[in-house]
């Protein structure tokens, strides 16, 4: 359902039934990677190949997957569930996510249904829902940061939110 390239050669594609594919040759060939057991039957809907040390993906069921470079293993080979606590003390977001945007090595933003926009500043340990002026009837489809401070969230019924303060 999504693909993200770090450079002209290295890319990750994700999809139905926990599918994760990795390419080292610009997409000419793809190799399967194992999704975490908890996500093996999930629809992975968005992927961000952020850097040589980190990549994140999300499922439509509110799960966040993370791949980090380890001693002798490049990013994209091993995937783990990102367990986190939201402000309500929950260990699962419990929302249908639609997109993830990586702003820095440790900061990412999430969008979803029912007016859901959230941010993590610590790599996903704590996820904080953001206050929005539109109420909970707007579904957000995508969020992108233009630079370190300015970003746009796009939602249902032509909704468009801008931030000038990093989310």
Q: Locations of the language-model features?
A:
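Residue-level hotspots at or immediately adjacent to binding/recognition sites across diverse folds
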Residues: 1-167
């Amino acid at each position: 359902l999504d693909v993200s390239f770090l450079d002209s050669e290295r890319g990750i594609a994700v999809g139905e039934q926990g599918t994760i594919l990795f390419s080292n040759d610009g997409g000419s060939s793809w190799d399967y990677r194992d999704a975490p057991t908890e996500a093996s039957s999930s629809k992975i809907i968005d992927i961000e190949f952020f850097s040589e040390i980190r990549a994140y993906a999300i499922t439509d069921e509110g799960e966040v997957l993370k791949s980090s470079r380890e001693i002798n293993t490049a990013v994209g080979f091993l995937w783990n569930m990102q367990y986190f606590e939201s402000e309500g003390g929950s260990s699962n977001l419990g929302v249908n996510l639609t997109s993830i945007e990586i702003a820095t090595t440790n900061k990412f933003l999430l969008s979803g249904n029912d007016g859901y926009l959230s941010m993590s500043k610590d790599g996903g340990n704590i996820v904080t829902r953001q206050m929005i002026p539109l109420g909970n009837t707007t579904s957000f489809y995508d969020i992108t940061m233009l630079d370190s401070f300015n970003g746009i969230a796009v939602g249902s019924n032509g909704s468009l939110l801008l931030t000038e303060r990093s989310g």
